[in-house]
Amino acid sequence: METKINNSISKIHNYIYANEGLNNFEVLDVLLKVLYCKSYDEMNDNLLEKVVSETDLYQTALILLENLKNAYPYMFSANDSFEIKEQSIIYIFNELSSFKITKLGTDLKGHIIQRIIDRSFREGRGQFFTPSAIVDFIVKMINPKKGELGCDPACGTGGFIFSALEHIAATNTITNADVNNVFFYDISRSLAKLIAMRLMFEFGVKDPNLYIQDSLSSTFDLKFDYILSNPPFGSQGRISDSTILSKYVLGKDEKGKLFSSQVPDILFIEKIISLLKDGGRAAIILPDGNFENPTSDYIRKYIFNECKINAIISLPDGSFIPYGTGVKASILFITKDSGANKKPYHIFFGKIKKLGYTFSKHSKPSYKENGCIDEDYSEVLNKYKNKIYDDFNFVISSKEISSNNYNLAYNKYCVAWKKIVDSIQKKSFSRISNVCSVVTKKEKILSEETYKYIEIGNISTENCEIVSCSILKGAELPSRASYRLEENDIIVAIAGNAIGTDYGAKAIVSKEYVGAICTNGFIVLRKATISPFLLLNFFNTKAFQAQVIQSKYGTAIPTISKEDFINISFPRYDKNTEEYIISTYTTAFNLKEQAKQLLKSLIQKGID
């Protein structure tokens, strides 16, 4: 039966998509209306069993939809229609005629919903979908209990709350009272229909605590024991309505002046905290920028003042790529306690590296050699619950964090990186600022002059050299074109996803590129008091990468500030080691130049 259901859902989805030109989300809305009509009919008059022609079937479908609008006015508006052609309606009802939804077991009903979710969200509208592995981890960390009130103020498909009910059901018998203790809130009517259908299919609930509303502008009568949420984030959906912003501390600057706009995830932090009972707990998925950006310190200070932070869990890069976004995110676990900042406490920092699926657009499950799902979030959960710490899962004092501008970046405190940096500082070391100067003066660009222009992509990360450039008039240069280069300058990328990795761009400027203009995505080091090869060698080490990782911030374009860069600790070697490094790099670069000239000669003249 499961295979038959899969085939029917797929055929219907493909038919509507091909014949109606609807997107996945619009197909979802049609599917839900049809499934509601069929379920409603089976529980009432069985009109569909009495149809004798396609015309009769079509008219019956219209009658059922009208009945639905009367029965569920909070779910269906008076203007709701199927919004597809008559023949498509007939096709869908015929495809579903071979099985009775109300006669299916709970598991099969749940499978129908999951199949719809997979087709409509995982394959199209991922912003409403949180990976099940992350949902499962969060629910186990929060540990919802029977009798507690829980909600998600931006519930999407309702995954968090359904998972919370499953968690409670693992040790208790689920009753109507348990379902009545959970609350769903979302702005989307279509998503509300999906949740209501799942509640009806799995729990027989016909009048759930399901509210179609914008949670940021709405008032709530209840306070909750736990809240689980992955609120919408990103600059594209910024809130600019002053009537909404005025309701939030985080909608204003420190002087109380309204921001012109604010991203929704920041407002949701405040909303969620306000909805918690004293002692209530919450888990919120947030972009890493909220944890680390210097300009976001007011957000973190607000959280510190209102809550006890229990844990910060760093999610892997690419966790949400299969679901529509590549933004790096972490999970914030809090307990509402405005007195928590008055005495120091420890905050757990954990890092999940594997979630059991591949981080690609067409994601697949990933397995270990023994056939088990390849994940390590269960291990992180165990370490948190049992206070087991290591280089990647550790605790930091709240006092240390508040003294660091409330920085909550996992990488800043990671024990593994700290050990590498400490190993440098236990020996002889300098700061980058002590051995060279930084070019800060921007070149005055003349619109008619021709320039060589160097971007990060013009660097060979394997050979640490500039391999190409663009030739552009001054008027054609982008606004980021900034610094004129001199021979033996060292340029190092301080922005982009590759910084702090083996693929970070760095190069020594050769005669060929003297006078070229480079992007401000580089820091330009000049007048080194030591051999540039010593610096170049250091920029290829794990010790350098660890310090960049500790200091970088930003989710869309990771960045390390120039101030943090020049403060990086640089090891000083003994004379013999320095001479060996300089000699080896000099030989390698000379051989590379000789090979380049020989190849150039061969290309120009050939061999007779």
Residue ranges and their predicted role:
Residues E487-F539:
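A short beta-sheet element
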